[in-house]
Amino acid sequence: MKIKLKICGMKFSENIQEIADLQPDFLGFIFYENSVRNYTENSIIYIPESIKKVGVFVNERHEKIIKTIQKYDLNIIQLHGNETESYCLELINQLNHNQLNTKIIKSFLVDDYFVFQTLNYYQMVDYFLFDTKGILPGGNGTKFNWEILEKYHLEKPYFL
């Protein structure tokens, strides 16, 4: 399995360019007003097509996600809140209705007591993301015990 690199929290043009020059696989832009890394520019500077643009959302309305995908030409969206199975299914319907071929990452906050059977309800998404359960939504600057991933037995690719 090839390891891929996703760098998230892109906000400033000069920083985006410097990181893009390093050719990561994915660049993440946060579209969550309560985040200090919320991306508010009118456009994203040129990024080579080989780098996929990821939009990160937290419990956002489908309509706003669709508009943001279209505005910034996002390749992937990351759902980093309490989005339910039915929320994800409806979002997929909206993406299809708008003829958007946008992939979906669904994040899960993991601690030593995470119930991996929960993932069975989210088979409709393209990827999972396992993040440390912390105070804030999104990255908290700490890692969880990766040994817990020995309990992961699905085929779906995931991010850490």
Question: What are the residue ranges of the model-derived segments?
Answer:
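Conserved N-terminal beta1-alpha1 strand-loop-helix module at the mouth
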Residues: 1-160
